[in-house]
């Protein structure tokens, strides 16, 4: 029986573990946290991710609980300058669900295959031999397996232990975030973007009924929002910086990188979690059918493509002055035709 160790129990690691278990591997999954996360980093779930998670049973459960986004609108002040539908066919039916709920559905699916996440296990070392990889946790716990998957995030211990460089750069400035409850916010199922002076931007993303995420490249996301929002409850606030990086390789011997351990980029477009899910599903299939030699090249190319799209979108949102006005004026005109709408939305959601 094929044995696999998975390091990291976010969406990427959980997807890898459940797909491997479904396909017949003996899998163990380890997480350094002391339990399942109650925080939500990602929200958007593409049709492709739901399709990939359908065989294990998590996809339909996620789709049933998630909200379905109707569209996105970009404003200058309170005036819309661009509007796109996101629900005119199944190919573009983007859903939204807090990441902790997505993880909960994956954990439930994993349990149906008899696998539990092993918490409070932080990787300390790896030993790679010709026929196995041994993961070390502390001084006394060693877990051998034929393959190991590093799905342990942007600060991956697996990646650093392998000596794989994480090439790229940090973007200047900090972004802020606020997850809030607002019963009166009118845009229940639409992304609402606001173009602010000096190239700044603020976005409101629906997460669940009456729950929203406000994101801005400013010190205080709620203060940056240029239109009134009556907030009933603040669930959390925080700040973050953006890295644009990619591992120089996704594989070293029988050890593989997936998700944020392999690539990170701006949240524009909501592609990060979905890219990690796709990495994991592809890798699980390749491990079980013996085609792992193609993983590095294929997923590196897809990661590079998503980084390029994400950066193009971020630069567009943060461009300044006349260039931005001309760009959105042009997009506003072409986006009124259904073929153009489909092309734009498919570019946003593909992969």
Which positions does each model-derived feature cover?
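Beta1/beta-strand and adjacent pyrophosphate-binding region of the FAD-binding site
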Residues: 1-12
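Glycine-rich FAD pyrophosphate-binding loop
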Residues: 21-41
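Conserved FAD-binding catalytic core of PHBH/FMO-like flavoproteins
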Residues: 108, 147, 151-242
